[in-house]
């Protein structure tokens, strides 16, 4: 006779199972478990009197015979491909199995072998996501990296050299000298890193040398002059050397309008930053570019989501970041031209429709590096409140919406920048960059951040206490964030051309250097659950935005979840 147990008791012991629903933090978003790959009555769990003991759930096999290094038991995975309950096996820093863990000598259906060489992380009651990817980083100060890691970001792509005036405004690491120094600096940080060279040049040789020096992409920024000639030159080099191009277009429309930029791009793949326009870009209608099939549009988090405070805070941020003078009327007019209620409101809806594919931070250059994930799910919450369930969802859950929004900060930036073979999702063979969340803190405070198979960050209590949990509990770096443990658990992304040219050896880099690949063969259709291409029109007088003829508008939020309730200091 099988033993029967109530759903509540089961969830409290092994975590939720198929059909169970979970509210995410203080949002109105409801997740429902779609599948459970663990076997009822044969679940593995660690602890006194529990299953993972020698001869029971722990096998006699050696590591050489397939035993994993780490098992995360009874994890609830939220990823673009599904919402499933499973055990996760990690070996050599990569995800080696998703399914049923245990001892094949005593249990059936085991595809993750637990042995004496296996560490256990209790995933019961936790939600697991892939480490987030922030693809719009101004590397202004190194302290950003700890803040990002503490929020669940494990990969940072962008440009900069520190608090230089150019870096404060643009995500560019210009030239071989600066690229080399940043690659060497990356050795000391416990996240994956990649650096963009400056793409503003009509002389292709000036761009090629940056890619060959180790840039993983090129960035076109209006503060350096994003002219049609520069756009064409930069994309030509990118096509030749297989790196992505990111663009911040011409707010002032000095060298042309959005139609001229589209013409200069010539149908080639490009990642458009802050495509709504408040972060910069052709005023007032850069947003229409999100309907192009070759354009991968992203947002930065200062406009995520639209709130009562969004417009007011932007003006001062703009003046500081772009080295503008409030005493000069033209500078003030430039800043004001970028801040439009109508396009910011439309941006919320375009994200919900899956027309905007990525959300990133714009760190310290109008964006907040530690709020990429929280702003993403604040937007999802606001859209559910204002627009109701998506057509793909029902009254029981918001699964499709959740998968759409998690994709914006994980798999889609990975695909866009040619690194999805390594990171961006919870899939076998990828780097074990995983974030564990307690449901009550989902999106705002990770419980554990696993980096390359080792714990890099965790909520931890008083180090002098007799157990790990006494107050004050707060996020702290863990062992793999220190010393030589960083090198085998983190990747540095370079162009394949730079790796073939021996840049890692010449710079004596110890971290694994991985090439970006296939950035030029992708399109909007490559974006998971975010590939909609509506025809966008903007009224030049009122700034109203229309998608396929329908007006896109919504009210600003007066309050938000994932905010001050969790952040008292």
Curated annotation (Swiss-Prot):
Pfam families on file: Amidohydro_1, Urease_alpha
Q: Does the keyword Cytoplasm apply?
A: yes
User: What's the record's note on cofactor binding?
Assistant: Binds 2 nickel ions per subunit.
Binding of Ni(2+) 2, residues: 219, 248, 274
Catalysed reactions listed for this entry? urea + 2 H2O + H(+) = hydrogencarbonate + 2 NH4(+)
One GO CC term on file: cytoplasm
Query: Subunit details for this protein?
Result: Heterotrimer of UreA (gamma), UreB (beta) and UreC (alpha) subunits. Three heterotrimers associate to form the active enzyme.
Q: What is this protein called?
A: Urease subunit alpha
Q: Which organism is it from?
A: Prochlorococcus marinus (strain NATL1A)
Q: What is the lineage of its organism?
A: Bacteria, Bacillati, Cyanobacteriota, Cyanophyceae, Synechococcales
């Amino acid at each position: 006779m099988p033993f029967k147990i109530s759903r509540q008791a089961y969830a409290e012991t092994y975590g939720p199972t198929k059909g169970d629903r979970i509210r995410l933090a203080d949002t109105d978003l409801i997740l429902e478990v779609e599948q459970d790959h663990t076997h009822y009555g044969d679940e593995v769990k660690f602890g006194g009197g529990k299953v993972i003991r020698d001869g029971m759930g722990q096998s006699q096999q050696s590591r050489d015979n397939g035993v994993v290094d780490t098992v995360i038991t009874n994890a609830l995975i939220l990823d673009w491909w599904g919402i499933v309950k499973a055990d996760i096996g990690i070996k050599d820093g990569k995800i080696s199995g998703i399914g049923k863990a245990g001892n094949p000598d005593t249990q059936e259906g085991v595809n993750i072998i637990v042995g004496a060489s296996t560490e256990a992380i209790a995933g019961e009651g936790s939600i697991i996501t892939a480490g987030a990817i922030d693809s719009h980083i101004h590397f202004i100060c190194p302290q950003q990296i700890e803040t990002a890691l503490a929020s669940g970001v494990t990969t940072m792509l962008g440009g900069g050299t520190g608090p230089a005036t150019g870096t404060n405004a643009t995500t560019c690491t210009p030239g071989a000298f600066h690229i080399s120094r940043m690659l060497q600096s990356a050795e000391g940080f416990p996240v994956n890193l990649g650096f963009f060279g400056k793409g503003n040049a009509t002389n292709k040789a000036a761009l090629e040398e940056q890619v060959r020096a180790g840039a993983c992409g090129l960035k076109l920024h209006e503060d350096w002059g994003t002219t049609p000639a520069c756009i064409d030159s930069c994309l030509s080099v990118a096509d030749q050397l297989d790196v992505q191009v990111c663009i911040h277009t011409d707010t002032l429309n000095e060298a042309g309008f959005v139609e001229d930029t589209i013409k200069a791009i010539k149908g080639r793949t490009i990642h458009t930053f802050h495509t709504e326009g408040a972060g910069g870009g052709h005023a007032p209608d850069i947003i229409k570019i999100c309907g192009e099939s070759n354009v991968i549009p992203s947002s930065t988090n200062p406009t995520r989501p639209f709130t009562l405070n969004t417009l007011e805070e932007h003006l001062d941020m703009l003046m500081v970041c772009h080295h503008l003078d409030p005493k000069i009327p033209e500078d003030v007019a430039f800043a004001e031209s970028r801040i439009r209620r109508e396009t910011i409101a439309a941006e919320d809806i375009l994200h919900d429709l899956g027309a905007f594919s990525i959300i990133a931070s714009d760190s310290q250059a109008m964006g907040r590096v530690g709020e990429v994930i929280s702003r993403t799910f604040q937007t999802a919450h606001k859209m559910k409140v204002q627009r109701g369930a998506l057509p793909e969802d029902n009254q029981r859950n918001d699964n499709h919406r959740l998968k759409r929004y998690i994709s914006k900060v994980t798999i889609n930036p990975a695909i866009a920048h040619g690194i999805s073979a390594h990171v961006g999702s919870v899939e076998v063979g990828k780097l074990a960059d995983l974030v564990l969340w307690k449901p009550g803190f989902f999106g705002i405070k990770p419980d554990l951040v696993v980096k390359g198979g080792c714990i890099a960050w965790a909520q931890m209590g008083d180090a002098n206490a007799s157990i790990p949990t006494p107050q004050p509990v707060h996020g702290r770096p863990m062992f793999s964030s220190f010393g030589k443990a960083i090198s085998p658990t983190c990747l540095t992304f370079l162009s394949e051309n730079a790796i073939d040219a021996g840049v890692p050896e010449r710079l004596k880099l110890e971290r694994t250097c991985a090439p970006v690949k296939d950035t030029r063969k992708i399109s909007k259709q490559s974006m998971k659950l975010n590939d909609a291409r509506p025809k966008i029109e903007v009224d030049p007088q009122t700034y109203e935005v229309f998608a396929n003829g329908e007006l896109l508008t919504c009210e600003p939020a007066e309050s938000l979840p994932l905010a001050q309730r969790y952040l008292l200091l």
